[in-house]
Amino acid sequence: MLVTLAKVEVSAFCNRTARAKNPLQQFDDLTSYMALYGLAHYQRMRTIIDYVQVMPHFKITQPIEACVIDYGCGQGIASLAFIDHLIESKLQIKCLKLVLIEPSAHALKRAIYWIEKKAKAAEINIEVIALACTFDELEPDYLASNINQYPCFHLFNNILDMYSAGIFSLSKLTQLIKMQPNENFIFAVSPDFSSGNRGFDALHEFTRPNTIYLNTTGTIEVEEYRYTSQKTSMRKAPVRVYAAKL
């Protein structure tokens, strides 16, 4: 009975939110998303950040002063993964500016809550700038007005598949990114499937980066909640990853 009920609830969630492609507007949907997908998306982003930042040709000045731009941040999964990497790597952090871009005001509020709790617990100086809008609604100076001269880390976590659906203009967005004279790093990750891959290919074509750290597909171990068994379990998950410096 519980398994049947769980299947019905998951099916209703997927139908109501277009498999979470629509901005989440209900508290229960935010919770369902995190339960179903949150941990796996966190692990994918942590994998790419952890891998790239130990590469010998990747350098970041300490104490760290940086700006993190989380595109389609949802509930802040990618930002939390980035912060956790810095903490667990025992890197000195002077100041982090987080620009959260998310059309759902409810998800954005939840992201701010989790990030501020993390910052307080770790005693990190973090400034959060929340932009409740779509990518196409961003002001041309959304970066210049927020980032000072900090290196910028642009995080695309499970979002590039929406490019294929025509939900936003990746060409326009990358032009805004490239206008900034700062150091710009891109970290993008998603489950490996065809529509998502088109977004990754377009991102590479539009940005024409100077340095490519990663641009590949692969498989990683992720822990996921399985509604059929009502518990978490490990599985091999296909991923598409992209990391570059413009």
Stretches with model-predicted labels:
Residues 150-166:
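A short SAM/SAH-binding and catalytic strip from SAM-dependent methyltransferases
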Residues 19-59:
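Class I SAM-dependent methyltransferase Rossmann-like catalytic core
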Residues 104:
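Conserved SAM/SAH-binding beta-strand->alpha-helix loop
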